[in-house]
């Protein structure tokens, strides 16, 4: 990975996207709670400069999953929740760019879009959690379609999308939507969590202001802060967790990963954390090239292999 050029990565991303298949998380396309939301879906494409092929979406009304399937599945699936400050979802930097590396090792990736907490959905701040719970249950129900073991489905999240993933790992059994079909009889608990430069806490000392604003507003109650500070929602049943962060992250402070590590360790949850001196925020795959942090996919895949 260290010697992969940006142009090679772009080519592999485009090939992965061309092969991918997308389907809705909710049966009618739109989420049940979207009926009261005024937002309109918008896809923004950026195909210029060094950040070429960097799509993002806003105004999501119904979550979708894009499947990046390997030639030889190893039975493990990963539901991916990309970041975007709880304002948008980036599709490539923390989505399609992962496919060449994880598919090569047999991992099937399911990159999802999800609704924003500030877009006026009936579930409010829990709209993203409703989407990711439903997504995990749907993947379990359909695991055979992709030659997967339903017990080996985990979640990987980045930045604000990491908060979505960590919400799934700590709040998987909370009823945030009404069951609509047999898929909802499945467990939403992921087999493992992989959290990359993740927003964890809502406490002001180390929070990410943009994500906090979108999730709980500017004047949250103490209960709201506790409810969405995921280091305070950890239990002994929280899945094994992999944490990755750059110490020089100027947006989401590295202390987010540190407090999550401490909370997991205190309750005996298996946890591994990798901190790198350099990387800034949002390095994903592309911006990690040429830095020591570029080894992170290999580290993560080796760790996953010990947990499933």
Which residues fall in each region the model found?
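N-terminal cap/lid segment of alpha/beta-hydrolase-fold proteins
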Residues: 4-73
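Short beta-strand element of the alpha/beta-hydrolase
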Residues: 75-83
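Short beta-strand/loop motif that positions the catalytic acidic residue
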Residues: 237, 243-245, 249
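Mobile cap/lid helix-loop segments that gate and shape the active-site cleft of serine hydrolases
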Residues: 43-52, 198-233, 239
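Primarily recognizes the serine-hydrolase "nucleophile elbow" in alpha/beta-hydrolase
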Residues: 134-207, 225, 295
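Catalytic nucleophile-loop/oxyanion-hole region of alpha/beta-hydrolase
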Residues: 89-91, 95-98, 112-150, 289-294
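Acidic catalytic loop of the alpha/beta-hydrolase fold
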Residues: 202, 248-252
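C-terminal catalytic histidine-bearing segment of alpha/beta-hydrolase fold enzymes
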Residues: 244, 254, 258-308
């Amino acid at each position: 990975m260290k010697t992969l050029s940006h142009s090679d990565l772009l080519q592999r991303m485009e090939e992965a996207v061309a092969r991918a298949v997308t389907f809705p998380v909710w049966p009618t396309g739109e989420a049940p709670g979207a009926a009261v939301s005024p937002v309109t879906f918008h896809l923004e494409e950026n195909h210029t400069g060094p950040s070429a092929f960097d799509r993002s979406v806003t105004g999501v009304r119904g979550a979708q999953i894009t499947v990046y399937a390997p030639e030889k599945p190893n039975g493990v699936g990963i539901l991916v929740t990309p970041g975007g400050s709880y304002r948008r979802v980036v599709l490539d930097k923390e989505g399609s760019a992962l496919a060449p590396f994880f598919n090569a090792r047999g991992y099937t990736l399911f990159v999802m879009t999800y609704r924003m907490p500030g877009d006026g959905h009936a579930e409010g701040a829990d709209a993203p959690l409703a989407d990711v719970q439903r997504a995990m249950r749907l993947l379990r129900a359909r695991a055979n379609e992709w030659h997967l073991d339903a017990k080996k489905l985990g979640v990987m999240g980045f930045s604000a999308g990491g908060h979505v993933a960590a919400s799934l790992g700590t709040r998987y059994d909370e009823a945030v939507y009404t069951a609509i079909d047999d898929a909802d009889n499945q467990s939403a608990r992921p087999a493992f969590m992989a959290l990359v430069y993740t927003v964890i806490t809502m406490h002001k000392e180390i929070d990410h202001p943009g994500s906090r604003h979108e999730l709980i507003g500017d004047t949250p109650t103490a209960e709201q802060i506790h409810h969405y500070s995921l280091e305070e929602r950890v239990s002994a049943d929280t899945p094994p967790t992999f944490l990755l962060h750059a110490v020089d992250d100027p947006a989401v402070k590295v202390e987010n990963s540190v407090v999550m590590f401490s909370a997991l360790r205190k309750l005996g949850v298996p946890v591994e954390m990798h901190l790198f001196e350099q990387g800034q925020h949002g390095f994903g795959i592309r911006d990690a090239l040429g830095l020591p942090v570029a080894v992170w996919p290999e580290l993560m895949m080796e760790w996953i292999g010990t947990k499933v």
